[in-house]
């Protein structure tokens, strides 16, 4: 018997350090082996007790009853656990059906189970927190899966971005054509205002959709809490089953130890009672038959318990596998949503910076244009009011987006059914950004038109200065002619006639030399006189200039 125990000892250690296939068996082998060895130990004890005295016979009669009591208690505990767990499953209804395929724990937890099942103690290498063993947090396959998903998303986004760019180019060309058909800038601004109103309506619709999505998120969070509660119940049932398995192992060990002690005692007794061996053979045979019957019963009970435990372990492993897969899928979806939100925030920041730069540029040009002409001041005031409205509405839009982003950060943990609708919202934000860029381009074109008009005004001012110089020259000539007329009146009529002819020829020559510059200056003065405040005064001076020498010549 001692030799057999020594052989069984290293066999157990070798099995615990065996191949991965044996590790996957988990607690099944740990629970099955002691139960199979227990009847053999009892049989050996029965054979050794046969030649004993009446006291040994009484002890034998009392011990099978105790063994039956222990086995009955263990079977009752198992039935209680099964009944409570089955009741929980029936009460859970359809909510637990998705959680029945929970995934199994990793290989480390399986090793800890086998270790605990064989020795009745937790493995020292793995820490226990709140009655559960910590699993390995970082798996090597998740990073590769994330990288492959990111590459697939980029490949899928490229054709979509190309299609979006083509659609945006067509919309911009249509908008530019409609703006070019309009003649006045007021009509262009009215068209832009209409398009901006359409954008506001679309934005309000998107806000309503965001509220609906938030409600759905709250429902998903409630479902997640329900699933966690069910998972905790399953973990409690598993802990109870593990405690039951440990009690069974302890019971089997106690049986083995008792069998070994009895074998030793009976070996000593055999040496003393070898003479009475032939008389007690009949009694021994009867006792052997009784023990065999009891052992067969115990074996059947152990086999039934082992089958039940195997079924329960398989169910737990399936459920744990399903739960691990669900959590990994949800983590990947959360990471994708976070990345998309960051991209949208960066795009919004860039649009704000561009808008501020363009606003400052337009304000500077407006100040300069106010100094140049009063008519452009009125148009610039209208543009400033519209820009103020745009900025206020854009700030409201930005505030709503910031609030929505805060709501998304609070509900980051599980987003299963929201990815499709979030993609639609991202498409709408890209459309909004494209339309904002088109409006900004239209404003830049207005600024370019303003610079062209400023250049035209400068050319007109140069022409007006030239006309003023001509008028001054004509006035000096008129004064000279008046002086000469006054001098000639005193000299005589004959001298006046001779002097007028050469003066008329010189005046006609001077007018012929200066007329090419005056003719082109007069045409733009007539057309562009309303654009500046100084034009009417110069025009009157130009009209009186060439008209005054006529009475002198007459």
Swiss-Prot record:
What GO cellular component entries does it have?
A: cytoplasm
In terms of InterPro entries, this protein maps to: Taxilin_fam
Q: Where is the composition biased (Low complexity)?
A: 91-103
Residues that bear Phosphoserine: 71, 515, 523
UniProt xrefs under Pfam families: Taxilin
One GO term (biological process): exocytosis
Annotated region (Disordered), positions in chain: 1-66, 85-166, 492-554
What superkingdom does the record give? Eukaryota
Annotated Basic and acidic residues bias: 143-158
TM annotation in the entry: none
Coiled-coil zones: 186-491
Single annotated GO MF: syntaxin binding
Annotated keywords: Coiled coil, Exocytosis, Phosphoprotein
What family does this chain come from, according to its entry? Belongs to the taxilin family.
Subunit info here reads: Binds to the C-terminal coiled coil region of syntaxin family members STX1A, STX3A and STX4A, but not when these proteins are complexed with SNAP25, VAMP2 or STXBP1, suggesting that it interacts with syntaxins that do not form the SNARE complex.
Q: What does this protein do?
A: May be involved in intracellular vesicle traffic and potentially in calcium-dependent exocytosis in neuroendocrine cells.
Name used for this protein in its record:
Alpha-taxilin
Q: Which organism is this entry from? A: Mus musculus (Mouse)
